[in-house]
Amino acid sequence: MKWIVIDTVIQPTCGISFSAIWGDMKMIIWYQPTIFLTPGSIFTPVKSGIIFKDKEYPITIYNITPFNKDLWSLLKSSQECPPGESEITNKCLHNSCIIKICPYGLK
């Protein structure tokens, strides 16, 4: 079964990502990724992680829940990454980020 990423929220202090996805139904997944799944990404879940662009990547999925508009709005409103001011300077101003490679290309 293929899943399509609709939107993704990253919490840089804990390295957790939340993605709204479409599979058999619209869902929210909470996971610790080894890659950043951008909107429009298509992947297949497997026992050890996911297959994305014909390559297997390990990820830890913590929870999958049916999509809930209010929950997704809450996640989006608490999004810390990327901070808006970083777009001007191209530098990440989030001092406690644990993500090794910024998915937004910030330094």
Curated annotation (Swiss-Prot):
User: Could you tell me the superkingdom of the organism this chain comes from?
Assistant: Bacteria
Q: What is its main location?
A: cytoplasm
Intracellular or extracellular location(s): Cytoplasm
GO biological process terms on file: cellular response to starvation
- Could you list this entry's UniProt keywords, alphabetically sorted: Cytoplasm, Stress response
The record's InterPro entries line, in alphabetical order, gives: Anti-adapter_IraM (IPR014448), PmrD_sf (IPR038679)
What family does this chain come from, according to its entry? Belongs to the IraM/RssC family.
Q: Under which name does UniProt file this protein?
A: Anti-adapter protein IraM
What is the originating organism of this protein? Escherichia coli O17:K52:H18 (strain UMN026 / ExPEC)
Q: Which gene encodes it?
A: iraM
